Amino acid sequence: MRAFRLILLTLIPLAGCHSAVTEQEGLIVLSRENTKVYPKTGLFASDLVESVDVISLENSEQALLHSAYRMDADEGLFFIFSSPNSVTHGVTLQQIKVFDASGKFRHNIGVFGRGPREYTSISKWTLDKNKKQVLIYDGSHIITYGYDGTFIERIEAKPLAPVYSMTVLPDGNMLALNWFRQDIRASHILMDPDFNITDTLAYLPFSFIREEGSAGGMLSLSGPGTISVYQENVLFVPPLCDTVFSYKDGHIQPAYYVSLVSSKPKNFSFRSEYKLWEFQQDLRDQGFDNRKSLRYIFETDNYCIFVSDRYSLWHKQSQKGLIFGGDPDAEYLPGSLVCTDQNSLICAVDALGLVQYKEKCEEKGRNLPSQIQALFDAGFSDEDNPVLFRYQLKTKSF
């Protein structure tokens, strides 16, 4: 059995702002000190976007996604995680559907069956873009497939549960974001036949994760969490956390900061110190919406991309940013799924969302972009597969 190393980072930072990274009695305590603050800048989408391509996914019966939860791209292929509403042998079927660059369906990964090379549950998954493999965590094993759907291996991994996000590092190791019921841990784990935990880096009891003035005194420990790898730098956000952390060469430090601040009891504002977006939400009327947390982060040669309920692009060299809006007045339409491929941002918009976008444009007397209008002219409906929008980002400085 192939052995490879897994680094398990399970960190939720303190909400106080007194020290950047400190070690005390075996604890690593993280705060927001020394995070950078940049001035607000006004940019249009056309300032950052070179071109937009629309990719229609095949709508055959075997290609239908039913519902889509996560997407990634590599080698001209789109990998989309679908959890159909159909049930086979009493088990809800979960699949990763693979499409090529033109939107043509290629094959499924994760088909229900009784053979040793098939499985029924996909807890988390990621791409190893160096080895061109799909790695799937099913709750007790990590199962590896080739991009063509060929089974490679299955490794027992029970100590990982629960995993909220996982990714492959440039050196071939893995990193998973995880917590336990009573505490948060950061551990080095060697995935050999004995699956040994070789070292514990940090232990942080939940009692330390309090934010003064927040409802109930503690942030809700829910939400997806996210990890991003760029060259040798790893960015990660614990579930429903307000700080993006950088992990490099064994060191952890705050990188970007999005703060959930209480301005008065039960009235919260979600504010980025980067001034990329601002919005208010009254908990008394609406309740806290987990979708407002950071759901994805990406880093490319030129950009940092933050995804909550909107898409915020930050040009690193110019230190200028832009919000992608989500209404008919927006210059471009974002989607619920997003991934990056070199210097392009790929968003998936489900069929119903695109139909509603068309209706809102009609209400406002606005013409649809020609590429979207062409979809409806060809018979597009709310029962079709999602549509992919590839935004090719400019690389120049401003």
Model-found features: residue ranges?
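Asp-box/WD-like beta-propeller blade repeats and closely related beta-sheet repeat scaffolds
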Residues: 120-122, 137-185, 200-213
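Short beta-strand elements that form the blades of beta-propeller/WD-repeat-like
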Residues: 76-89, 132-138, 172-181, 228-245, ...
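Short coil/turn segments at the loop-to-beta-strand junctions that recur within blades
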Residues: 61, 110-118, 157-163, 204-209, ...
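Conserved blade-ending motifs and adjacent loop-strand segments that build the rim/top face
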Residues: 256-273, 280, 287-288, 318-342, ...
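Blade/loop signatures of beta-propeller domains
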Residues: 21-58
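Repeated scaffold domains used in trafficking and secretory/extracellular systems
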Residues: 67-70, 120-125, 160-168, 292-295, ...
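Blade-loop segments of beta-propeller domains
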Residues: 58-63, 67, 95-99, 104-131
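Beta-strand-rich domains and repeat architectures in extracellular enzymes and scaffolds
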Residues: 53-92
